[in-house]
Amino acid sequence: MLTFIFVNNQNFIQPLEKAFPNYVIKPWNYETDFTLYKQNSLVLASSDKELTYLSHSLLPTIAYGTPNDTNQLFGSDYLVDSLEELDSALLETVFCRYHHIPLTIAKHKDFVLREITFSDLDSLWQLYDKERNNPSINWFPFSPENKTERELFYQYISDSYRFYQYGLWGVFSPDTNILMGHCGIINSNIGNDFCLELCYFIGDNFRRKHLAFHACQSIIDYCKKMKLTTMLYARILKDNTPSIGLASTLGFSMIQSLEDYDLYGLPL
């Protein structure tokens, strides 16, 4: 768990303490011993020299710019123009990405929406088993026994969440951590235009409990918070009455009727 935020300027300690009261803000310099902080810390740096030094510390970093800055700041995966751009979500994201901890997207009394991990693949396959011929579901890789599909799954887990900050997430029981379905955002196209599409699947044993509505609403809220798009889409087969009703309840409206499915949109 992220506990300590190290900053390289004493003048920033008090403002950071005020902005992030849940973390311990500590100063650092080239003599700081980070040995005891490797599992629960993040370091802020503002120069190429500092980032080069920190590359050997085995700690996650965020680079930040300063007025009249001439540094390239290529030594960190994360860069903000100033410390004022920091927020708790970014700090937690950087920390979790570095330590390969799945990010939690939303929490609800009935579910936890979080990133899928390698260890979830077998549970995902068991969940899909009864629905393998369902044409309305956007699947993760279909068979974990297939080496190529398993490798594609690993690649998705490794790259998609990190690069896009969205994807298909797991819907887990908050009490038992049982995987109940998936729900999320996929890249898609309308004609030649790129768009983001809402997708969901709830396992048969967990339906009729309003999980799909609350999970999808959490994703809509996430899209707004992250400013991912100004219009979210959903493709629904014409005979999928439950999904049509869900889309309407969420605020989607049909914008185009095609041969096999209807296209719905929700302005954000």
What is each stretch, according to the model?
Residues 1-108:
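Asp-based, Mg2+/Mn2+-dependent phosphohydrolase catalytic module
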Residues 2-6, 15, 78-205, 221-222, ...:
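GNAT-family acyltransferases
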Residues 45, 65-67, 235, 248-266:
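Conserved catalytic-core motifs of GNAT/GCN5-like acyltransferases
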Residues 52, 244-245:
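Alpha-helical segments flanking ligand/cofactor-binding loops in enzyme cores
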Residues 177, 210, 240:
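Conserved G/P- and acidic residue-centered "switch" motifs that form tight phosphate/ATP-binding loops
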Residues 206, 210-219:
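Conserved acetyl-CoA pyrophosphate-binding loop and the N-cap/start of the following alpha-helix
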Residues 233-244:
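Conserved beta-strand-loop-alpha-helix junction that forms the acyl-donor binding cleft
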